[in-house]
Amino acid sequence: MTKEKNVILTARDIVVEFDVRDKVLTAIRGVSLELVEGEVLALVGESGSGKSVLTKTFTGMLEENGRIAQGSIDYRGQDLTALSSHKDWEQIRGAKIATIFQDPMTSLDPIKTIGSQITEVIVKHQGKTAKEAKELAIDYMNKVGIPDADRRFNEYPFQYSGGMRQRIVIAIALACRPDVLICDEPTTALDVTIQAQIIDLLKSLQNEYHFTTIFITHDLGVVASIADKVAVMYAGEIVEYGTVEEVFYDPRHPYTWSLLSSLPQLADDKGDLYSIPGTPPSLYTDLKGDAFALRSDYAMQIDFEQKAPQFSVSETHWAKTWLLHEDAPKVEKPAVIANLHDKIREKMGFAHLAD
């Protein structure tokens, strides 16, 4: 018998609003998702699609002008939307759900040594003595690839490179022993070579510690190399969801087609790369129909009038597009992403997607 997958976090119909200059900006519009224990879920989409805002609702880190206006978030039987005080969130934030941010310098205290910042977390979350915490901290530093960790334990953040600082942030997250690790664009500020190293490190640690991961990115190349499931976000909604193989090889929403078409590895022989026309809609307005319709070559009249429901493609794959309605005209996805399986094998080398 196959082991039944354990859903550890369930978000239902989440709406997040921000008060901005006497207006209301709706950043998340009715998002629902389930997080399965041990899996890596990638949240992908353009900047402003709501990826980071959504995960902030899981850790109580919305800005002061933001609020969850609707919906529920169940984490292992606990309603996170009922938490209000900093003390309430202390039991969840870091201890159960930890976050690695894009810029490691926003996570590190510049006037404290690296070692003191790691040991502080170990003492708080693991209840170790100072001596035990130092030994563990050096062990974590070694695990994340810090050379000469014994000596560098007493150095300050400014003495570390950007890539090494990000490794320290990962070490601090590990020291919390989280159940869920949110990686919010953790490689964006790093050069390509260091990005690959950090991704490999996260994959290795995920395999060793078996924590559940939410990986936020706009880079589908990263998604292909690390994710089990993919949620494609646009204008505060999830418009397509499936396994990484389903989203890459059998995408159904026109926005997903556009994202895949813009993969740098799919540039033509002249080096020309597809870019999505237009700009995302204003989130201050009440969006009617499919928010992507104005930018889509495949939009039908109904896309401008009614929001599409979830159409199931398989037990694990769905998309919100009227193109999946039984009466919709049959259209072909863009030629550039046709036979994507072969192109991935030939040009992109994502091992777990190439089979």
From Swiss-Prot:
InterPro entries: AAA+_ATPase (IPR003593), ABC_Ni/Peptide_Import (IPR050388), ABC_transporter-like_ATP-bd (IPR003439), ABC_transporter-like_CS (IPR017871), Oligopep_ABC_C (IPR013563), P-loop_NTPase (IPR027417). Keywords: ATP-binding, Cell membrane, Membrane, Nucleotide-binding, Peptide transport, Protein transport, Transport. It is a peripheral membrane protein. The keyword Protein transport applies. It holds the Pfam family oligo_HPY. Gene3D superfamilies: P-loop containing nucleotide triphosphate hydrolases. PANTHER family: DIPEPTIDE TRANSPORT ATP-BINDING PROTEIN DPPD, OLIGOPEPTIDE TRANSPORT ATP-BINDING PROTEIN APPD. This is Oligopeptide transport ATP-binding protein AmiE. It comes from Streptococcus pneumoniae (strain ATCC BAA-255 / R6). The gene is amiE.
